[in-house]
Every structure is written in structure tokens, then in C-alpha cells.
């Protein structure tokens, strides 16, 4: 039986179970995770991405040199519009 080509998707969605045979050899059994495991994995990755976005955003705020209230307001509005546009398209 031929094994399907390993891709990043199949590698990340398959779990490898190693079982010992009676003679000491190890066999690998590829097992597809259930939907709950996939959703859990997806949510974990997305929350990490979201945390990274927030960190980058705060670093940009902290890098501003003595901003005026007007420049902050302009910056916030630009970021808000950009963020909303990305939310609607994704």
C-alpha cells in the first residue's frame, strides 16, 4: 500500500502513534485527528497570531516620540479602518 505524499498540511493534521510489536520492532500508525482536535489546534494558532498582532501594535505605539493628541487620533482612526477592512475581507 502506497503512503500519500507528506505535505505540511498532512504532517500537521496527522498524529503518529508508535506501537511496539512482539519482536521489538516499532510500527507507525498514521491517524487523522477528529474535528474537535482540528478546531482546538486552529483556535490555538489563531490566538497566538492575535497576541503577536497586539504586541506589534503596542510596540508601534511605544515607539512614537511625544505624540500630540491630534496625531494619536489620526493614527487610531487609520488603524481602526485598516483593522475593520481586514476583518471583513477575511
Curated annotation (Swiss-Prot):
Localization terms from the record: Host mitochondrion inner membrane; Host nucleus; Host cytoplasm, Host cytosol
Organism domain of life: Viruses
Main location: host cell
Keyword Membrane attached: yes
Pfam families documented for this protein: PB1-F2
InterPro entries recorded: Flu_proapoptotic_PB1-F2
A GO-annotated cellular component: host cell nucleus
Other observations noted: Is not encoded in all strains, and seems to be dispensable for replication.
Subunit (UniProt): Oligomer. Interacts with human SLC25A6/ANT3 and VDAC1. Interacts with host MAVS.
Name this protein carries in UniProt: Protein PB1-F2
Gene label: PB1
Amino acid at each position: 500500500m502506497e503512503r500519500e505524499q507528506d505535505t505540511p498540511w498532512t504532517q500537521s493534521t496527522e498524529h503518529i502513534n508508535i506501537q511496539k510489536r512482539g519482536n521489538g520492532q516499532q510500527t507507525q500508525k498514521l491517524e487523522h485527528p477528529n474535528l474537535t482536535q482540528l478546531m482546538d489546534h486552529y483556535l490555538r494558532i489563531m490566538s497566538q497570531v492575535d497576541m503577536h498582532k497586539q504586541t506589534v501594535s503596542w510596540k508601534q505605539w511605544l515607539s512614537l516620540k511625544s505624540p500630540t493628541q491630534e496625531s494619536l487620533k489620526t493614527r487610531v482612526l487609520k488603524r481602526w479602518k485598516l483593522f475593520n477592512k481586514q476583518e471583513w475581507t477575511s
